[in-house]
Amino acid sequence: MEGKMPLIGEKFPEMEVVTNLGNIKLPDDFKGKWFVLFSHPGDFTPVCTTEFFSFAKHHDDFKKLNTELIGLSVDSKISHIEWINWIKQNLKIDIKFPIIADPMGHVATKLGMIQAQSATQTVRAVFIVDDRSTIRAILYYPMETGRNISEILRLIKSLQMVDKYKIVTPANWPNNEIIGDNVLNPPPATQNDIEERTKKYKGYAWWLTYQDANKADVDEAKEITGE
């Protein structure tokens, strides 16, 4: 599994992985679906346990967005099974998504998930892959800070709206401080685009115009992110 780390806009590399739920072929087994592949430094650790609890709590919200979850660490399959059983018994929640067992670190190395300070532990990385197997976003968090699961949901919803409506979303959407839950138009490409934008849309300048977002999409975004 040698090679450079995959980048946003590239196809997710093909691989077969071992999980607590059986072997999976990536990305082939998820064709037609989005998926979030996220790594964690280790089983039976405090921050990772809170993250898995939150991912499990929001599992149905990811499914509403046609998105599957896949965890990963360099722990063994047995360790994953024991850990999620502990979470179920003590925190009263089921982890129903697969967790990749990568004890030799081959998958983590291929995806650029290994920490600089440690040759064996994975960082808190997130790969968001769309229904065409294209990497749409890559996020990294330090060991000391747990991920915001609502932000990952918001990002997926935004990317799906970009695909559907050919728009772009502002900071903190759907609660932007300037245009609220409206969405932005992408930068105009030609002089004709500039003239059309200023006639058709509201805005502050020819390069900063916006339009109403679909209400159902706004409502869903607010629901899944808890806004």
UniProtKB/Swiss-Prot annotation:
Thioredoxin domain boundaries: 6-161
A biological-process GO annotation: hydrogen peroxide catabolic process
Main location: cytoplasm
Subunit relationships: Homodecamer. Pentamer of dimers that assemble into a ring structure.
Primary enzyme class: oxidoreductase
EC number: 1.11.1.24
Location relative to the cell: Cytoplasm
GO-annotated cellular components: cytosol
Entries under Gene3D superfamilies matching the protein: Antioxidant, Horf6, Chain A, domain2, Glutaredoxin
Catalyzed reaction equations: a hydroperoxide + [thioredoxin]-dithiol = an alcohol + [thioredoxin]-disulfide + H2O
UniProt-annotated catalytic positions: 48 (cysteine sulfenic acid (-soh) intermediate)
Pfam families on file: 1-cysPrx_C (PF10417), AhpC-TSA (PF00578)
HAMAP family (UniProt xref): Peroxiredoxin
InterPro entries: AhpC/TSA, Peroxiredoxin, Peroxiredoxin_AhpC-typ, Peroxiredoxin_C, Peroxiredoxin_TDXH, PRX_1cys, Thioredoxin-like_sf, Thioredoxin_domain
Record's miscellaneous remark: The active site is a conserved redox-active cysteine residue, the peroxidatic cysteine (C(P)), which makes the nucleophilic attack on the peroxide substrate. The peroxide oxidizes the C(P)-SH to cysteine sulfenic acid (C(P)-SOH), which then reacts with another cysteine residue, the resolving cysteine (C(R)), to form a disulfide bridge. The disulfide is subsequently reduced by an appropriate electron donor to complete the catalytic cycle. In this 1-Cys peroxiredoxin, no C(R) is present and C(P) instead forms a disulfide with a cysteine from another protein or with a small thiol molecule.
Chain sites annotated for binding substrate: 124
Protein name (record): Peroxiredoxin 1
Known role: Thiol-specific peroxidase that catalyzes the reduction of hydrogen peroxide and organic hydroperoxides to water and alcohols, respectively. Plays a role in cell protection against oxidative stress by detoxifying peroxides.
Keywords: Antioxidant, Cytoplasm, Oxidoreductase, Peroxidase, Redox-active center
Gene Ontology molecular function, alphabetical: thioredoxin peroxidase activity
Family (UniProt): Belongs to the peroxiredoxin family. Prx6 subfamily.
